């Protein structure tokens, strides 16, 4: 399965060895891919169809568009369902299994604007974000009736995989109360999205409407075990492991990878190498990131920066990682929510899904991760 989820924009930036415009610097080992996503910074996804074309969910939701030229241009929207039906699919992660089944996960929300009680530092009873699923077995020509496997308050999904065993594994945040925070489940399907099982809860504490265990990235190791890298407000990812296809996550520990309060993206390549792109805790040559105020509703004492994205790789299933290298930095607006797609074996596309406008689109060969992706001097305006 090839999956990428993103916040995209219509215009891209060409990568070169110097500043790409007055505010952005891109590592010289990276070039610009053909990918130019439709729409604005809204949650979208892109998958590779069986014939090599690309498909993404339209930024307005309830429709798909297809590219036959590697993402340069996109077709007119094809509706998923009638706008008059009781449940209309919104934007969300789109998965294509190896069997050719498309799975669209989406949320139906209520009470979003008043979701947080600042005085109680907790979620309001009116806030709902139910998780829904619809499937297509003919590459989007027709879709099944949407099903709601889980009701409640579920958060943004930033990563999903189909493991070699065929299980579809999707980390998803869930709103927890008293105090208000996020926890994380994995939802697992052994039948290409027809039915779903929810794992045990990952709860790391916290208090804030962006605090806790949130927006996890998931990958598979060579021995079939799964790992989630969970976004936290604790100055680093937490590593959570499963040895039973994602149904139970029994081993939890703080990662050796420092990270700010932002999600990363980890991708297992065809070669077996793991690639991670993320916002480190501090800028490469800057002062330590300040902690947020304890009264901030987002986090409780979190730190981080979104001015730089770093990349690293592992050749031993995450036991060790190559020294992180900054691949893009921006002096004013932020860079965050990265995504990695192995478009072809050894060809990586990387882009940002939130923060900067236009988004960053990067391309690099896997061989260059070892040979050319080295630390370069700090960018000077």
Regions found by a protein language model. Name each.
Residues 15-381:
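Asp-box/BNR beta-propeller blade signature and adjacent active/binding-site loops
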Residues 1-10:
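Bacterial N-terminal signal peptides
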